[in-house]
């Protein structure tokens, strides 16, 4: 019998009906204040709609998420007294979670504006293959590429 619970869908968000946006709102949420998190995310989408006229904010968000999400990462494994950094493919659920985490982290580190403006700026930069969260993804990919020699140690 499987010990792992079944996958629970979070359902769509209020405005777009998109499950990914709903997951992002949940990632932004602090202390169970979902309304505050939703307001921040939707305000960020409104700012994107203002600044990038003719662009759908949901499409900018999706493009940014695909640009931030890592494909490979390194995992530590101990082999014969030595610890190796082994490159491994990232599962799709973890890929999204890492993208949310990095976007939230690097948006918060931006200048002293509102959080919605910070998210909007980071999402627009990520959609254009720029920004700190995309640099983090590139750094993770470089680490995996540098340790390609240890790929045969896979779990």
UniProtKB/Swiss-Prot annotation:
Keyword Transmembrane applies: no
Origin: domain of life: Bacteria
GO MF, one annotated term: rRNA binding
GO biological process: translation
GO CC term, one of those recorded: small ribosomal subunit
Entry-linked InterPro entries: Ribosomal_uS7, Ribosomal_uS7_bac/org-type, Ribosomal_uS7_dom, Ribosomal_uS7_dom_sf
Keyword annotations: Ribonucleoprotein, Ribosomal protein, RNA-binding, rRNA-binding, tRNA-binding
Cited Pfam families: Ribosomal_S7 (PF00177)
PANTHER family: RIBOSOMAL PROTEIN S7
NCBIfam families: rpsG_bact
Family: Belongs to the universal ribosomal protein uS7 family.
Listed HAMAP family: Ribosomal_uS7_B
Function statement: One of the primary rRNA binding proteins, it binds directly to 16S rRNA where it nucleates assembly of the head domain of the 30S subunit. Is located at the subunit interface close to the decoding center, probably blocks exit of the E-site tRNA.
Summary of subunit composition and partner proteins: Part of the 30S ribosomal subunit. Contacts proteins S9 and S11.
Protein name, per record: Small ribosomal subunit protein uS7
Lineage, broadest ranks: Bacteria, Pseudomonadati, Chlorobiota, Chlorobiia, Chlorobiales
